Regions:
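C-terminal beta-signal and adjacent terminal beta-strands/loops
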Residues: 76-90, 116-175
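Transmembrane beta-barrel architecture of outer membranes
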Residues: 52-56, 109, 166
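Charged, glycine/proline-rich intrinsically disordered loops and linkers
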Residues: 91-95
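Gram-negative outer-membrane beta-barrel transporters
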Residues: 1-84
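Extracellular loop and loop/strand-boundary signature of outer-membrane beta-barrel proteins
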Residues: 39-46, 96-101, 111, 154-159
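Hydrophobic, well-ordered secondary-structure elements that form the walls
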Residues: 7, 25, 59, 72, ...
Length: 175
């Protein structure tokens, strides 16, 4: 099952004294459920790869006279399953066979792009992708049994990497 709500807004900002600017927003709340029995740790879990929310927003600048365009874009997605766990064999009490679901954790992504035309033939474009360059974290959430028999919820990082910024520059000549 998959259901949700999405909002999409686009607004020219000239009403606040910014005649060449516009703003856009897209956001969604999604509820997804897949039902399994016996093969995963969670019999009723979110769909793999489906975020419970996403936010995209941006400020855009467009000046026809100067032939200049710019955009500052923000994106965030919610925690999502990237690897489905398994629980086969856990009925015998062998906890070593339990593999929890693996989640990609939310992070903020900010992009900037600028393009400028020179006459009718030349265009220069520059962009920076992932300005914030936040780390990507994959985590598992497990319940550990301590020596005294009590249980404790544990969050463990299974993978972490920093994708880094991407910077681009292009010069185009159109015939």
């Amino acid at each position: 099952n998959n259901y949700g709500i999405e909002v999409d807004i686009k607004k020219d900002l000239s009403f606040i004294g910014l005649p060449n600017f516009s703003w856009s927003f897209n956001g969604a709340l999604i509820k997804s459920r897949v039902n399994f029995s016996g093969t995963t740790l969670m019999e009723n879990r979110p769909m793999q790869g489906q975020s419970p929310y996403l936010v995209n927003t941006g400020i855009f600048y467009k000046n026809e006279k100067l032939q200049l365009d710019a955009a500052l874009l923000y994106n965030r997605i919610g925690k999502r399953i990237i690897g489905v766990g398994r629980s086969e064999g856990t009925t015998s009490g062998n906890e070593a066979l339990r593999v929890p679901d693996s989640y990609e954790m939310p992070r903020d992504v900010l992009d900037l792009s600028v393009s400028k035309k020179f006459g009718t033939h030349w265009e220069v474009k520059a962009n920076i992708r992932d300005i914030l360059a936040q780390r990507v974290y994959y985590k598992e959430f497990v319940t550990a049994t301590l020596n005294d028999g009590t249980t404790k919820k544990v969050e463990q990082i299974t993978r972490s990497f920093k994708p880094g910024r991407n910077i681009g520059l292009s010069i185009t000549y159109k015939l």
